[in-house]
Amino acid sequence: MQNILITGSSGFIGSNILLNIFNKHNIYITSRSKISIKLKELKVIHYKNHLDLNKKLKKIKIDIIIHCGTHYVKNHNVSDINKLTLANIEFGVILLENLKSMGVKKFINFSTVWQNYNGKQDIAYNLYSAFKLSYSKILDYYIGKYSFIRFYNLFISDTYGENDNRSKIINLIKQNIRNKKKIRIVSK
């Protein structure tokens, strides 16, 4: 069994990964607050701030990090900037700074296709995707620094899956079929 650290385990991607691999590995998750996930053998790394997280990461051995943690806002306000910075840059850099001390062999990062908007390299769609683009550039530095670790940077377009109740196109189509309404789908 491998020791796997999953960040963003309360989000859609992270929670689904957690539930799918939980019985096959020793799973660690990070959390700043109480969690609703009730899995008996789950190891929760509670932390108050990023300095506290840094200390706690130095004390554990991890084979694989699956980094799904993020703060997402499509249209930001000035009040979102601190959360975007802490979640999308600082938190991830603390993980990267501890790769060697934790003994990490693989680092899997979830990014967004929006950081290459309309197929244009390094042109962000919004501030969120600009932060994800910045983190990808930071990740490149660590890829060069730690050649003994396998890095994967996954560019996700969208997600949908079992128990997904968000207002996604599939759910909207199903809802309109049930209500016998037409749905107009338009592309630009």
Language-model-detected regions and their locations in the chain:
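Conserved glycine-rich Rossmann-like NAD(P)H-binding loop of the short-chain dehydrogenase/reductase
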Residues: 25-32
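N-terminal Rossmann NAD(P)H-binding glycine-rich loop of SDR-like oxidoreductase domains
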Residues: 3-23
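SDR active-site strand-loop-helix element
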Residues: 7, 30, 65-71, 107-113, ...
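NAD(P)-dependent short-chain dehydrogenase/reductase
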Residues: 127-129, 133, 137-188
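NAD(P)H-binding glycine-rich loop region in Rossmannoid oxidoreductase-like domains
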Residues: 47-87, 118-119
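Conserved Rossmann-fold NAD(P)-dependent oxidoreductase catalytic core, especially the SDR/UDP-sugar
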Residues: 67, 93-128
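Short loop/helix-cap segments at secondary-structure boundaries that form the rim of catalytic
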Residues: 33-41
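Glycine-rich NAD(P)-binding loop of the Rossmann-fold in SDR/ketoreductase-type enzymes
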Residues: 83-91, 126, 130-133
